[in-house]
C-alpha cells in the first residue's frame, strides 16, 4: 500500500482523474467535478440527529434536536425563524400546517453566509428554487454574516427574522442562547424551523476509473468490505474520527445529484 496525503480535496480529485491514485478520500463537491474519471466506492457515515423530516412542523415539537448514536449518510440544512414579530408569524403559520408564500418569506430579513457556504447559502438557495422558483438573491432583505454563530446572535437579538444553517445548529447554541447570545427565553421557545432541505450526502471514498487495479469489480468489493470492517473496530474508528466519520456504507453516483445541482448554482453565482 502506498499512501500519500493530498494537499486538498481538489488535489485528490486530480490524482484520481489522472489514475495516479487508485482510491481517495474526497468531498461530495469535489467528487462531482471529477466524476467523469472516478466513481463512488463508499459513503461516509456520521452520527445523525433525532429529527429528519422534510416537514418543518415536525421539528417544532417543543424540544431541541438531540445527537443520537444512529448513523447517517447525509445531513440536512434548516431555515430557522426567530423571536422577532415576523419570525413568530412565520413559525405560527408553519405550525398551523399552512404553506408559506414567497411574499411571506420576502417580507422577512434573512441572515445568510457567503455564497460558497453549503449550509449557509447554497442548499437553502436550492430549497428556495425548488419551492418558489427564486433564490436568495431575489430576497429583498438579506444580511451576510461571517459565521453561523453571528447569524444565531442576530436572530436572538431580533436583528434578523430568519437564518439558514445546518440541522444541528440549535444543539450547539441552545445552552448559550440566553446567557451569551441575547435570547430572552429558552431557544426552543423563541425559534422554529420553517424549511428543511433535502439530504446532503457526506464525504466519500472514491475510486479512479483510470486505475487498472480498480477495474476489477471483485477487488473493489473486497476493498470496500475491508474499509467497512476496519471502521467497525475501535482502532479504525479512532483513525477515521479525524474526518468526523464513524463508519462507511456502499454508495452510488446518483446520491450526489444534489451536489451537482449545488455546483451548477455556484457556477451561476460566480458567472
Residues of each region from the PLM?
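Extracytoplasmic/secreted proteins, especially bacterial periplasmic and envelope-associated proteins
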Residues: 11, 15, 20, 29-33, ...
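Short loop segments at secondary-structure junctions
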Residues: 3, 82-87, 209-213
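An extracytoplasmic/periplasmic, membrane-proximal ligand-sensing/linker region
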Residues: 217-271
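Periplasmic-binding protein-like
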Residues: 43-78, 180-221, 241, 245-247
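A conserved helix-loop-strand patch within extracytoplasmic ligand-binding domains
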Residues: 45-118
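Beta->alpha turn/N-cap motifs
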Residues: 5-9, 19-32, 36-38, 42-48, ...
Amino acid at each position: 500500500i502506498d499512501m500519500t496525503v493530498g494537499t486538498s480535496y481538489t488535489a485528490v480529485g486530480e490524482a484520481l482523474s489522472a489514475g495516479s491514485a487508485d482510491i481517495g478520500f474526497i468531498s461530495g463537491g469535489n467528487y462531482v467535478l471529477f466524476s467523469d474519471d472516478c466513481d463512488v466506492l463508499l459513503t461516509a457515515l456520521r452520527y445523525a440527529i433525532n429529527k429528519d423530516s422534510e416537514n418543518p412542523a415536525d421539528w417544532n415539537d417543543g424540544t431541541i434536536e438531540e445527537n443520537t448514536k444512529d448513523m447517517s449518510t447525509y445531513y440536512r440544512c434548516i431555515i430557522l425563524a426567530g423571536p422577532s414579530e415576523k419570525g413568530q408569524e412565520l413559525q405560527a403559520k408553519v405550525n398551523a400546517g399552512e404553506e408559506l408564500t414567497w411574499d411571506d418569506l420576502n417580507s422577512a430579513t434573512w441572515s445568510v453566509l457567503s455564497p460558497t457556504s453549503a449550509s449557509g447559502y447554497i442548499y437553502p438557495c436550492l430549497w428556495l428554487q425548488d419551492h418558489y422558483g427564486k433564490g436568495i438573491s431575489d430576497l429583498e432583505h438579506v444580511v451576510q454574516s461571517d459565521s453561523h454563530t453571528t447569524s444565531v446572535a442576530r436572530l436572538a437579538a431580533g436583528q434578523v427574522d430568519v437564518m439558514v444553517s445546518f440541522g444541528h445548529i440549535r444543539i450547539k447554541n441552545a445552552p448559550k442562547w440566553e446567557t451569551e447570545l441575547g435570547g430572552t427565553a429558552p431557544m426552543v421557545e423563541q425559534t422554529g424551523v420553517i424549511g428543511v432541505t433535502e439530504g446532503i450526502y457526506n464525504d466519500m471514498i472514491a475510486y479512479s476509473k483510470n486505475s487498472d487495479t480498480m477495474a476489477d469489480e471483485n477487488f473493489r468489493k473486497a476493498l470496500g468490505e475491508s474499509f467497512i470492517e476496519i471502521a467497525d473496530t475501535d482502532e479504525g474508528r479512532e483513525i477515521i474520527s479525524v474526518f468526523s466519520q464513524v463508519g462507511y456504507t456502499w454508495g452510488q453516483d446518483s446520491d450526489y445529484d444534489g451536489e451537482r445541482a449545488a455546483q451548477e448554482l455556484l457556477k451561476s453565482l460566480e458567472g
